Amino acid sequence: MDCRSLYDLWCEKVTDPELQADLKAMDESGDEAVIEDAFYRTLEFGTAGLRGVLGAGTNRMNIHTVGQATQGIADFINGQANDGEPGTVAICYDSRINSQLFAHTAASVLAANGIKSYVYPRLQPTPALSFATRYLGCAIGINVTASHNPSKYNGYKVYGPDGCQIASEIADAITQAIESVDMFDDVRTMPFEDAQAAGFAIYIQEEVLDAFLDAVYDQHVEQEQSDLRVVYTPLNGTGLECVTRILERIGVTDIHVVEEQSKPDGNFPTCPYPNPEIREALECGIALCEQVHPDLLLATDPDADRVGIAVKDGDDYQLLSGNEVGVLLLDFICRMRKENGTLPEHPVAVTTIVSTSLVDPVAAKYGVDMRRVLTGFKYIGGVIADLEQQDEKERFVFGFEESYGYLAGTHARDKDAVVASMLICQMARYYRTLGKNLYQAMQDIYREFGFHHNRTVSYAFEGSAGAETMASIMTGFRSQPLSEIAGYKVEQFLDYQQGVGGLPSANVLEFDLEKGNKVIVRPSGTEPKVKVYLFTVGESASEAECLADVLSSAMAVFMK
């Protein structure tokens, strides 16, 4: 069916007033490309679930695409039941527009299919969903979130019984089930209140959240308590309750919350891109820092799985990168656990192929087996699962992604800004007793192991034409691999689609350059972007940064 025919079908079938208004606005715009973009494909379900722009259409996040996906999941769960009791589902949602509506839509569809769901009664962080899926023994977890995307987006992440985002085999099976569902005629549903009354939609009790916070607290390091002043912003998301509770539990009570970003608000009125990686999102927090002079600024993204920090350096506040915080945390956790006698024999840490190489000498310093996996925290969770199968999960000490995601402990199998915030504050308190802040501590590591600079440059390609351009860029690199970049010889070209080092196939290309420099290119798994990762090494910070500028300019030529 072509886009205009699909549009006409939706006009006939849709009864939701907001979606009806959206459909009407499309027609009144007089721009056929608007209709085409909303209907040229069905929102793709993958290992990251669904993610897309809110609105009417098959390529949009709405109650019909959510209903279709949930019906597919219900069919998958019931198909696994083998005439027994079907598995249950844990459901969580963030502060985004329609997140609660989509969570209740999912619970209603599951209920109509005879499947019980456990739903958080209020918004909670992503790691609380990963934990609840495991704690409640659920077959599937559903988290309605689009992480740190702009406000026009929402998403629908799916987790397996281990608390990890689903593997490709399960995603493929669910996709097959979804594709056989007509989103208007085949989706079984019932009112959420009726699902509750029938005992099929059950609110998660407070004891589950308490158990999650207990598990987070178990990862604290023993240290002398001392004063620490923190400015914290949840960026209008889910982090406020859990982060402040865990900080108070470790004795950090001097917490100044950024008022205009404290309440859940899916419009994200203070920053269009609520991403703790970027300075714009932290400007309100930095303004408060100028008034109260804290030891550090903490910022969690809307679903509180990522955390960014800033600390004072001279007259300004410096943002530390995800790689820098990951290296600092690895060093701190290993140092403290070694001093406390709790570092396990043959400890294991995990990061991804796009994270800094600076972790390698730091890990070696403590005798840590540093493992690298593909991008996506589920692969870090997979290493934990492998250790668990060998009855060795206590060997896992830390995992991180360069995109500001960290995990200590095995209570969750996704990145956890709650446990990371706790450990960052403990780390800041430790260095404060030495007369340093975290920025200064990072400079010490650079001086010890060399100045590594890492930079991620993203190129956006919207719509159907953008998807074709992204595919063309990757095909071009494969068909004619670069022999040099900005005059630096490519010493090794790796195509992860062919399998590298025993890792699963992935649409990632790596160019290893002379003198320890590197460029990696991959399409984002959650946004219409191509990401270029730059890794440079220099005898000074400025030298490494200048080289990254040169490589960035050279790669920009190909992003058209």
Q: Language-model segments: what does each one mean?
A:
Residues 14, 18, 34-39, 43, ...:
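Gly/Ser/Thr-enriched, mixed-charge loops and adjacent short helices
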Residues 290, 294-296, 316, 336-522, ...:
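Phosphate-binding and adjacent anionic-ligand microenvironments
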Residues 39-59, 146-149, 234-246, 302, ...:
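Conserved phosphate/anionic-ligand binding catalytic regions in large, soluble enzymes, centered on
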Residues 100-105, 130-134, 152-158, 179, ...:
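Short acidic, glycine/serine/threonine-rich loops at helix termini
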Residues 7-106, 198-228, 238:
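An N-terminal, well-structured beta->alpha segment
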